[in-house]
C-alpha cells in the first residue's frame, strides 16, 4: 500500500478538500475569464465613444496586426508547453498544491495574452484607426478567449 493511500485512510477528508480546491481554482479561472470578457466589452464601448482623430497611425496599421498575431502565437505556444502538461500532471495528482498553482498561473497568462489582442484594438480605436479593424481584434480576442478557456481537471 502506498503512503498516499495510507494517508487517505488516516485523513478521509483530505482527498475531498483537495478536490474542492481544484474545483475552486477552476471556478476562479472561469470568473476571471468572464471578467476579462466584460472588460473587453467595456473597452469596445469606451473606444467607440472616445474614437481618436483619423490619420494618426498613417500607413502603420500593419504593426498592431503583427503584434496581435505574435500574442496569439505566444498564447498557443504557452498553452501547449505549459498549461496542458501541468493539466495532465494535475489530473494524475490532484492533491499537489504546487501543480494547482502552476496550472492556474499558466492559464491566467494565456487568458491575459488573448485579452491583450482586444486591448490592441482599444489602442487602435484611441489612435483613430478604422472601427472595423478594432472590432475585428475584439472579435478575435473573444474567440480565442473562448477557444483557450480553462479546462476542468
Regions found by a protein language model. Give the residues of each.
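Membrane-water interface of transmembrane alpha-helices
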Residues: 2, 74-91
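Core segments of transmembrane alpha-helices
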Residues: 37-41, 68-69, 113-119
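Short, hydrophobic transmembrane alpha-helix segments
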Residues: 47-58
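Alpha-helical transmembrane segments
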Residues: 58-73
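Hydrophobic alpha-helical transmembrane segments and immediately flanking/interface helices
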Residues: 125-152
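Short membrane-interface loop/juxtamembrane segments of multi-pass integral membrane proteins
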Residues: 90-113
